[in-house]
Amino acid sequence: MAARLLAPPGPDSFKPFTPESLANIERRIAESKLKKPPKADGSHREDDEDSKPKPNSDLEAGKSLPFIYGDIPQGLVAVPLEDFDPYYLTQKTFVVLNRGKTLFRFSATPALYILSPFNLIRRIAIKILIHSVFSMIIMCTILTNCVFMTFSNPPDWSKNVEYTFTGIYTFESLVKIIARGFCIDGFTFLRDPWNWLDFSVIMMAYITEFVNLGNVSALRTFRVLRALKTISVIPGLKTIVGALIQSVKKLSDVMILTVFCLSVFALIGLQLFMGNLRNKCVVWPINFNESYLENGTKGFDWEEYINNKTNFYTVPGMLEPLLCGNSSDAGQCPEGYQCMKAGRNPNYGYTSFDTFSWAFLALFRLMTQDYWENLYQLTLRAAGKTYMIFFVLVIFVGSFYLVNLILAVVAMAYEEQNQATLEEAEQKEAEFKAMLEQLKKQQEEAQAAAMATSAGTVSEDAIEEEGEEGGGSPRSSSEISKLSSKSAKERRNRRKKRKQKELSEGEEKGDPEKVFKSESEDGMRRKAFRLPDNRIGRKFSIMNQSLLSIPGSPFLSRHNSKSSIFSFRGPGRFRDPGSENEFADDEHSTVEESEGRRDSLFIPIRARERRSSYSGYSGYSQGSRSSRIFPSLRRSVKRNSTVDCNGVVSLIGGPGSHIGGRLLPEATTEVEIKKKGPGSLLVSMDQLASYGRKDRINSIMSVVTNTLVEELEESQRKCPPCWYKFANTFLIWECHPYWIKLKEIVNLIVMDPFVDLAITICIVLNTLFMAMEHHPMTPQFEHVLAVGNLVFTGIFTAEMFLKLIAMDPYYYFQEGWNIFDGFIVSLSLMELSLADVEGLSVLRSFRLLRVFKLAKSWPTLNMLIKIIGNSVGALGNLTLVLAIIVFIFAVVGMQLFGKSYKECVCKINQDCELPRWHMHDFFHSFLIVFRVLCGEWIETMWDCMEVAGQAMCLIVFMMVMVIGNLVVLNLFLALLLSSFSADNLAATDDDGEMNNLQISVIRIKKGVAWTKLKVHAFMQAHFKQREADEVKPLDELYEKKANCIANHTGADIHRNGDFQKNGNGTTSGIGSSVEKYIIDEDHMSFINNPNLTVRVPIAVGESDFENLNTEDVSSESDPEGSKDKLDDTSSSEGSTIDIKPEVEEVPVEQPEEYLDPDACFTEGCVQRFKCCQVNIEEGLGKSWWILRKTCFLIVEHNWFETFIIFMILLSSGALAFEDIYIEQRKTIRTILEYADKVFTYIFILEMLLKWTAYGFVKFFTNAWCWLDFLIVAVSLVSLIANALGYSELGAIKSLRTLRALRPLRALSRFEGMRVVVNALVGAIPSIMNVLLVCLIFWLIFSIMGVNLFAGKYHYCFNETSEIRFEIEDVNNKTECEKLMEGNNTEIRWKNVKINFDNVGAGYLALLQVATFKGWMDIMYAAVDSRKPDEQPKYEDNIYMYIYFVIFIIFGSFFTLNLFIGVIIDNFNQQKKKFGGQDIFMTEEQKKYYNAMKKLGSKKPQKPIPRPLNKIQGIVFDFVTQQAFDIVIMMLICLNMVTMMVETDTQSKQMENILYWINLVFVIFFTCECVLKMFALRHYYFTIGWNIFDFVVVILSIVGMFLADIIEKYFVSPTLFRVIRLARIGRILRLIKGAKGIRTLLFALMMSLPALFNIGLLLFLVMFIFSIFGMSNFAYVKHEAGIDDMFNFETFGNSMICLFQITTSAGWDGLLLPILNRPPDCSLDKEHPGSGFKGDCGNPSVGIFFFVSYIIISFLIVVNMYIAIILENFSVATEESADPLSEDDFETFYEIWEKFDPDATQFIEYCKLADFADALEHPLRVPKPNTIELIAMDLPMVSGDRIHCLDILFAFTKRVLGDSGELDILRQQMEERFVASNPSKVSYEPITTTLRRKQEEVSAVVLQRAYRGHLARRGFICKKTTSNKLENGGTHREKKESTPSTASLPSYDSVTKPEKEKQQRAEEGRRERAKRQKEVRESKC
């Protein structure tokens, strides 16, 4: 493609399309038909497909014409032209271009069979169609039409408007049809799917107009699809819709799996809970005196009585009657009521398990977790608390697992799509550069010749070599990305090959992608201009070195960092002056070494425009432009790169950070950088460089090149030249010398880091001031706040004006932050002037945006804003699609259900008024759709089903749910996660340059240190001591600091004359003018000392110590710290040498028994207190030492640990008994008291033993020991308090609640949990960081909430009737208070408990909104609010909904998903540190995990022998056939179907039919069981599934006869049959199409160990919190979410409540009663059986309890689930993409068993051909296969047998080809084999199949020759008979005894001795390396 485009197309490309052109096309078509040879066979290979011509992607219809074609010649706009794309040379097409150069392609056949391309009418139609105004008109029409669709009651004249719209659409379609043709050829009207939409819309419009089709509103909804037309008009949207459709396709497997799982769970639910939810408390006994007898005429009507609502018990304040159950742990009825089935199900009868369909809906609701707490509570109340287990299963498997799988799939689809577009962009850029080169070449050649003579010609081969060598392009992110799938990778590789082939013609043998990556940005660094290093190098080395900063250190010269340009390393020999090679000696030059690791070459700088406040002043900043031009460069640099001033990127601690070779610099002079006044410019290389390296200008660069560079710059400027002129005149103020002087002074002040610090402090204070607003406020306080606001506004305004003076408006507004500041300041000033205008108080909220200024100096906030910015950019199109979807569904809902809501409103509301959630008008309809997208669909759907019928509502809501929620929101998440990658995270942290804030902090520290020193010195001087000694350390400190950073490894530093020598032997001196490097001999070699990192020395100017980061200094004393900083040094992706840790650092492990106890005290203690020093050789000391050793042995003993664990579990269990009934159970209470003491003593003893054994140092430096210590201390204190009788003290009571932490001690003992906790602790810093950022983010919304709603949530309420007063009766607080005076008990002026009266309360309210729990009440209160202290009015302030919508999108959506992003990202980083191991698993679990992953992990098993008995044998054959299995599976499925048919209300007849069908199934399964037992004999019980089947059959038979008894005491036996569905898993292997589902299940299996650990941790957290809840909230008043079953009174109830909140469901209900204060509760309420008084909660404790639990469980644990599933899913997908999967190996072994019935693991050679043919694809070698098998050269052992692994390996090799992977696979298989067969003697192979064949052939040849010889001798006749014998004999002998000395052929077998095998492997490796080297050299 590129090759084709390289020739500049020029104006002759534009040829008008004439009849001759058409004739030419026809001629070409005829020619190509003649040329085409007939196909040899039907098979086509992928390569052929690839080599076929494809349409050029740049010249697709709808794209802009590439600029290389230049401008369209006059008169050819909107005129048919010949096609540009060679692909269409043999197709009848032509193209037309409009003014915007957009390309339209048409079919050249006659449209509608009449209008040829040259017809006038058709040409006019084409002109209209391609005109931009035409599409604008259509777009406006669609938008206007959409507006009209939103009218719920359209006016009469709207009918005419409708006709107008239809007319316009018809005209549009006619134009398209005339221009394009209707449907016959390509590019006609109906060939574009988007036109189908138009066509159907128009047809529906006409049909509905002329034919009466009944329900018009349903058909009117069709018009809504017009909104979709916007997608076809806006280009970006089509791609997003493409991505959506792709992800839906990918979701098919997950959908199937989800439906299957839900069906299984629904069946279980059906069996368990059928009819239970109708249990109600009915008045009992019946009172017959009432009117039921109806005047004695009619008898008592039981049906009517049972269904009469007035007879049910309803809890006051609730709408639904109370449910109950008849089991002991279900809900009980109050006195006078009996529990029985009556009335309908809850929620209009829609929540039930009575039929399969309702059960399925209930389960779907559980999976999406919508209002599931309600279902959970109802079911537990009706069936019993034990059924919590069912919900745990469904939530963890269904909800967490399946929903996250959907996320994983969408994320993968998105990632792949992204990858493809990225590659395309890169390809485009490479082509663009190549074209530019071509265009410039002509102008250049003359000068090039002249230059070449003067500078020494550069030979062509050098250029070629350089093209090769410089090609270290960084790995594309697809290679790095885990989520890109196999097929995509293969496609990409093919594309790459093709691309390279095509481009090599245009380039001088250098891969253009590499050239692009490595050449300078303008593409104009001509090769002819490259000169040898020394020519330019000398000139610039001085300057460069002074500017070379230490990568990764804060020394980066800050003043110029922002204007640095994307400079690129030149590939190959001709490097930039001052680059690393300047210092490399000739032998070890960087490039020569870099051969082996291509990806470690230098790559372009990241275009991160983090400029400091100097940037504006330092000249026109160009960073932004470069990033615009080459967006892809941004991504090219991964996070561990650091940038020096030259723009050379070195990858610290990543690939290629250690450049090969000793880096020995020449002696070069350093120029000290003097600290310039900020006004003067510090000139750096970066500034000298404009686009190309302009340093060339100084030496050689010719004027021509210069002009070219400028030309390119010109072409890439945003604005017209006149704008720059204007800017220069008016926006850059340099009018007068005095003015300039003033500017410099102001600049000095404003740019000072201290001013930045002051401003930051002001921002924080201002935020605090705004956060202090509350309701009610005193006037004085309000006044203080107002004054504060004025002061801050003044400060910020002053800052802005001063900056404007210092920087000039032009430069001021170059920087994003300044624009932001200006915007906020203007708003603040505007707000001051409009302060008194009513309704503009919202403007105050804009002040809050100042908080974002903190981002300047807070990297995480900065990152968050960037991420949101990036995503919003990328999400723009997605958001539009989402908006269109929401709009369409809102209109559909309004059109379909609007009327029904109005007409049937009484069904859903007793007052017959429209409820808050309805679809009668567009706004409310929109709100419902938005609510569904938030995941709350079930409640609104019930309403809809009640008023508008079930079918339609279900369809519409399910569509919104699936399309909107699952797909779009998941795409959002995927986008967020992808923009949230390590790059963004690390880039902000170590961006190399420090912000002003850090500098000012360092200055302050420096000042404090200086003051201290002076004081110290002063004191010293007065005490007559030598001053000099004391001052010296400061210099030393400075030098150490500098060196520590320079060395970057924090090694020890010694003073060495003038030089400092670090632990690695490199030295760097500071302050000396000429530098030398002293390098020890043993450090010389890079190999000996892989730690050697050489940094270029730096001159230390005055300013540099400001940049010193104090943390870096600490690394001297902390080698660990420095290791962390070099975070993943060992990841040697690119480097040839891994960095080994220093030897000393690795402690030699000794066997644990012999370790002596550590020292008791720290060295400091021992020095200060001599008594701590003990001689352990004699006397008391010796006894003490013996005691310690004894204690050590005890503590280290396994039994001791087990005993302690047992005690911990017992003591934790004991806590669970301390519920509200403990005082009634005297014995238990006494036992617990004694047990508590015992436990305390045991734990104290344990602690004393550990102190003695380990010593204080070891004990108190271990975090887990601290935990133990604190918990024991709490127990001890409460024990002492009890003994002293202080147990009732408040403080002691609260201490006792801390005993709930006891189970935490189990953490350190259970490895599974400890692993997870360690991983979590590792993540805490980043989680905290994000939590803080979220809090800041929410602060803005909270303050805004306070501004909008403070004091407006109060209302006047009648406590007795529980009714709010209407606004007509009570208007405000004063009126309510008057009423209260008259009737003080009943009426109250109340506040909503969750409100916005202050920022703290606002946070709580926002948390409820963000978790969508309790958010309705908050929103209703907001929407009804009027003014502070006024009675609310229904929907008076309806647009306040929008505040919540915005908060949900930004506050909830972005920030909560950010948590997921951070956690996933963090664990991925931790995994990298642990070498890719899973950090959530213990060692044992890792083994299991690896076993799951390893291929070929099976070994041949001994099959069940076939019985000798004839009949048994026949049955055996029948039972072991696959068909038999499949039939049984089908029977199981049929049985399931019959179970689905069951309903709760079925008739007697139906019941009988089902009974008999069930009986038939039981007989079938019994027969299967009997047959199998008969055939398999005792082997039947060796298979797990058979045992399970046997148990199920027995239970079913027993169940048939004893059904009633079993049902009563156990679960129904039918339930076990549901479990048999698991057997379906066995069929999946047989279905080829089920590969995707197998992958998903495989992913689940792989996730299990890690998920189990997290589950364990979650259980522990729940346990601790439930104990805590019991001790704090046991006596809380029953209301809202707390009642007789769901409460904190007992341990079981607490666990039930906490499990519910794990998904954050219903936590608002549980919190509300705890927030009660009198008079809502009573402090004196008695509790019978307990001494406790009162039923009030403790609000602060309650809020802390719930919020912390939600953050821990919901955000952390649940998100860890997501992280693990995403991870394992990507691994599983990679594995399933392999050509050979686990299943292929399994089938191999299954077939093997038939050929090797005794499981000898060998097969005879003669059977090999049959075996190979019997295998399944891909391992199968179909017959005739003899020759192929012989060629495989398989080793054989005596007896002509071949080992299974050798065969498997050879066949695998045949599938995978010979590759490195194969060696790994082979090794794995051999390991497994040796591990599973330790007893096997190593069989020595004696020959191979190939050798055998060679022997046979040679034997035949020899025999023939010998025969001929004998014949010639005349012996032949006599010896015929004996010859035959001999022949047989020799043959047999040969078989039996091949001489051992025979040199064996070259084969490699499992059965070979180990040593020889290793040697061979080593040789093979050397051979391969040699080959690769040869290949590389041949390329050069």
UniProtKB/Swiss-Prot annotation:
Intramembrane segments: 356-380, 922-942, 1400-1421, 1691-1713
UniProt effect for mutating residue 960 to D: In DEE13; uncertain significance
Effect annotated for changing residue 1872 to L: In DEE13; gain-of-function mutation; increased voltage-gated sodium channel activity; impaired channel inactivation
Catalytic reactions on record: Na(+)(in) = Na(+)(out)
Extracellular side: 152-158, 212-217, 274-355, 381-387, 773-783, 838-839, 893-921, 943-955, 1218-1230, 1283-1290, 1347-1399, 1422-1438, 1542-1552, 1602-1614, 1669-1690, 1714-1742
Positions with biased composition (Low complexity): 474-486
Glycosylation sites: 215, 289, 295, 308, 326, 1358, 1372, 1383
Alphabetized GO MF terms: sodium ion binding; voltage-gated sodium channel activity
Impact when changing residue 850 to Q: In DEE13; uncertain significance
Effect of residue 410 to L: In DEE13; uncertain significance
Annotated GO CC locations: anchoring junction; axon; axon initial segment; cell junction; cytoplasmic vesicle; membrane; node of Ranvier; plasma membrane
Annotated IV repeat ranges: 1504-1801
Associated disease: Cognitive impairment with or without cerebellar ataxia: A disorder characterized by markedly delayed cognitive and motor development, attention deficit disorder, and cerebellar ataxia. Features include bilateral esophoria, strabismatic amblyopia, unsustained gaze evoked nystagmus on horizontal gaze, ataxic gait, dysmetria in the upper limbs and dysarthria, with normal strength, tone, and reflexes.
Protein name per its UniProtKB record: Sodium channel protein type 8 subunit alpha
Organism: Homo sapiens
Lineage, broadest ranks: Eukaryota, Metazoa, Chordata, Craniata, Vertebrata
Gene: SCN8A
